Amino acid sequence: MHKILLVEDDPVIRQQVGKMLSEWGFEVVMVEDFMEVLTLFVQSEPHLVLMDIGLPLFNGYHWCQEIRKISKVPIMFLSSRDQAMDIVMAINMGADDFV
């Protein structure tokens, strides 16, 4: 079973996306403590990271860079932001895709 690390600060969106992914057959690890993103990444060994940009403490770009230092796992930003600059920043920070 493929594992997805879901990094989303909005609890409603996190639960909805997590439920949908689980129903599609994925194992989902949901981050709720945003100081633990890197720790949960290492512990869970996901096949994909779905991440929001606007997170408390450190934004998604920061965590993308930190994950890129240790792994080539695909990182996809899942965000309501749709400005070209947000997409360019995500790709420049090491993301593989932006939805």
Residue map of PLM features:
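N-terminal/domain-start alpha-helical segments
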Residues: 1-99
